[in-house]
C-alpha cells in the first residue's frame, strides 16, 4: 500500500487522481492517508532529509510505503557532480519519501511532473536505480527533459518494481 500524506492542503479530487496514477504504475493500493503538519522550526527551503525525520509517523504495515507531498520548496542538494535541485527525496530501500509540487499553482496544473517525481522517489523505495531511458520515471530528475515526460516506467523498471513488490508480499 502506498500512503500519500499531505503536508499542505490539496484538492481531494486531484489527490484521488494522483493516487490512481500511483496505483496504475505500481499495481498496489494507494490512498490519501491525511494531512499532517510539519513541526515548527523547520527553515525554508526545507531540508528533505530533516523533514522526513521530523514529520509525525504514519501508522502503516511493514511493506507499506509513505509518500509525503508538500507545496514548499526543498533545499538543493550537493552531489559529487555538483548542486542539483531537489524535487524529492527518498531513503533507498526504506519506507518514506517526500516530494514537492513547488513551481506549480496546484496539483492539476503540475500533475505530470509531480506524478513523475512521485514515481521516481517511490521507485527508489523499491530499490530501483536511475534508468538510461529518458521516457522512464527513473531517469535522473535533474535533467532538462525529465519534467516533460509521462509518469510511467520503461519495461525493465516496471518488471523490476513488480518483482520487488511480489517479494515484499511473500
Spans of features found by a protein language model:
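Fold-level signature of zinc-dependent metallopeptidase catalytic domains
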Residues: 1-12
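Metzincin-family zinc-dependent endopeptidase catalytic domain
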Residues: 10-117, 129
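Metalloprotease/metallohydrolase-associated module, dominated by Zn2+-dependent proteases
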Residues: 87-113, 129-170
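Conserved phosphoacceptor histidine of two-component systems
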Residues: 120
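Short active-site segment of divalent metal-dependent hydrolases/proteases
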Residues: 123-124
